[in-house]
Swiss-Prot record:
CDD domains: CYP3A-like
Protein name: Putative cytochrome P450 cyp-13B1
PROSITE patterns assigned to the protein according to its UniProt record, in alphabetical order: CYTOCHROME_P450
PANTHER family listed in its UniProt record: CYTOCHROME P450, CYTOCHROME P450 FAMILY-RELATED
Keyword Heme: yes
Native source species: Caenorhabditis elegans
EC identifiers of the protein: 1.14.-.-
Cofactor: heme
Molecular function terms, GO-annotated: heme binding; iron ion binding; monooxygenase activity; oxidoreductase activity, acting on paired donors, with incorporation or reduction of molecular oxygen
Pfam family, one: p450
Gene inactivation effect: RNAi-mediated knockdown results in a 25% increase in lifespan.
Annotated heme binding sites: 456
Function per UniProt: Cytochromes P450 are a group of heme-thiolate monooxygenases. They oxidize a variety of structurally unrelated compounds, including steroids, fatty acids, and xenobiotics. May play a role in the regulation of lifespan.
Keywords noted in UniProt: Heme, Iron, Metal-binding, Monooxygenase, Oxidoreductase
Length: 510
């Protein structure tokens, strides 16, 4: 009897604690959606079949530009006020340098000795600053010019493989873009020597990572009790969400590649051979050290990396370089097929600017309308909204709202990108021309890659890759929407937004 009373009292105490936590925003005069007991709004937001970005957009329409919700015991503030976002991403970066985690079993995100999963995307503090400084040269204009031929070779091979669909039958063009982007990033980041479209086993592994549900028991426990995350990790050690599943498979691929390259470079050094810089692995290994001590955040960065750093970098490059660009290409192709008059304008520009079979890097900079097509596609279908989230690491204010340490902030990218206040009455329409004239729009009006110091380091690579692929595709084919083409795309994903399929027809250009 005594034990039952203790359990009842314990349950009542825990229930009371969560009831109090879930008044956090109301006590500050901020509205938001009602959640479930204990877990708050987490269940709704963890559905792979209903991307959270679209649900948050729906909530914004109901509650306004600033509202709050709960992931278990953690208050989350959603913002689509551009001045507040400028504070978040730029003016008060030191208070919000941490990105909101995509994995609730992540380990210490600021520790230099953590597992490779603590990478450029997830890391914080001094470790993030060091990794960012090391990665940035690989995405400079000079570096992009050097790797352009690799991107173009994969793009040509992709379009050649599409020739089988000249028979007038519908096909899922998104699958080709997924193969293309994985091929490119494998060659740039992992040293894959040649194009291997539709022969890369890693494609299915990466696809499954992005399509996995977040409704798993260990994650429920960690959103309920974030302070006991490490205990949860030990309790569920054998659970796939903790072991990693496909994440662990991809990390193993990266680990084998990096360790093999380290051994190769050591052997070359013994023989007196100079190590060439062929890919991102070599770029990072030029700063290789068996052990690194991160200095205090905000100080000068020491450019050194461990093997775990390089493995983590390869891992995040494979994931980020695969999904976002493939999805961007799929959305752009869908919109062009639905708007043939816009496609013709893009084709005319490509025909005029590109004078030979090759599409050079300099050609890319001249394809203004094609660039506008990609940017407009990313406006209508933002793919990486999670890059636009932060966690408060030092108490401060955002606008006139006091933000405690540990509170999470999300930008509602969809509401920004579809705002008639920003983009006019045709905000829901595909109008690439809006990008061709100088604009006085707020810097936070278009943020598909995030903003501020933590803006996606691979943004220029992704845009260049997308334009290269589209230029080669549009030179040879018309993209046609037919009876099998989706009237509305079915969007999936917990971390990024991906179309289930984009069914189009190819028509060879005469």
């Amino acid at each position: 009897m005594g034990a039952i009373i203790v359990l009842v009292v314990l349950f009542a105490t825990i229930a009371g604690y969560f009831k109090w936590i879930h008044t956090y925003w109301r006590r500050r005069g901020i509205s938001g959606p009602e959640g479930l007991p204990f877990i708050g709004n987490y269940y709704d937001l963890a559905d792979v079949n209903k991307p959270r970005g679209y649900l948050i957009h729906k909530w914004t329409q109901k509650f306004g530009k600033v509202f709050g919700y709960y992931e278990g015991a953690v208050p989350v503030l959603v913002v689509s006020d551009m001045d507040m976002l400028q504070e978040l991403f730029l003016k008060k970066f030191d208070n919000f340098y941490a990105r909101k985690s995509t994995n609730h079993i992540h380990g210490n995100l600021e520790c230099s000795k953590s597992e490779p999963r603590i990478n450029l995307f997830t890391s914080r503090g001094a470790r993030w600053k060091r990794l960012r400084a090391l990665a940035s040269p690989g995405f400079s204009v000079k570096a992009l010019k050097q790797v352009h031929d690799v991107m173009e070779d994969s793009a040509i091979n992709m379009v050649d493989l599409m020739a089988k669909h000249e028979d007038g039958k519908p096909f899922n063009i998104h699958a080709y873009f997924q193969e293309f982007t994985y091929d490119v990033i494998s060659r740039l980041a992992m040293g894959q020597p040649n194009s291997e479209l539709f022969n890369n086993s890693g494609v299915e592994i990466v696809k499954s990572i992005f399509m996995r549900t977040h409704r798993v028991l260990p994650w429920y426990f960690t959103v309920l009790f974030p302070q006991f995350e490490h205990l949860v990790k030990r309790m569920f050690y054998n659970h796939a969400a903790v072991q990693g599943g496909d994440i662990e498979k991809l990390l193993l691929i990266c680990k084998k590649t990096v360790e093999s390259r380290i051994q190769e470079r050591e052997e070359n050094a013994k023989l007196g051979f100079e190590n060439a810089e062929n890919d991102f692995i070599d770029m990072f290994l030029n700063y290789y050290s068996e052990q690194v001590e991160d200095i205090e955040f905000g100080s000068t960065v020491e450019k050194k990396v461990t093997a775990e750093d390089v493995i983590g970098a390869c891992f995040v490059f494979l994931l980020a370089g695969f999904d976002t660009t493939a999805n961007s290409l799929a959305y752009a192709s869908y919109l062009l097929a639905k708007h043939p008059e816009k496609m013709k304008l893009a084709q005319e520009e490509v025909d005029t600017v590109v004078g030979s079979e090759n599409v050079s890097y300099d050609d890319m900079t001249k394809l203004k309308y094609l660039d506008a097509v990609v940017r407009e596609s990313l406006r209508l279908y933002p793919v990486a909204w999670f890059a636009c989230s932060r966690e408060c690491v030092k108490p401060t204010t955002l606008g006139d709202i006091y933000i405690d340490k540990g509170v999470k902030i999300e930008a509602d990218v969809m509401s920004l990108h579809r705002s008639k206040e920003i983009w006019g009455e045709n905000a829901d329409d595909f109008v690439p021309e809006r990008w061709l004239e100088p604009s006085s729009r707020h810097t936070m009006s278009w943020i598909p890659f995030g903003a501020g110091p933590r803006q996606c380091v691979g943004m220029r690579l992704g845009l260049s890759e997308a334009k290269t692929a589209l230029a080669h595709l549009l030179r040879r084919y018309d993209l046609v929407a037919g009876v099998e083409t989706e009237k509305e795309l079915n969007i999936l994903g917990c971390t990024t937004t991906s179309p289930e399929a984009v069914t189009l027809y190819l028509k060879p250009r005469i």
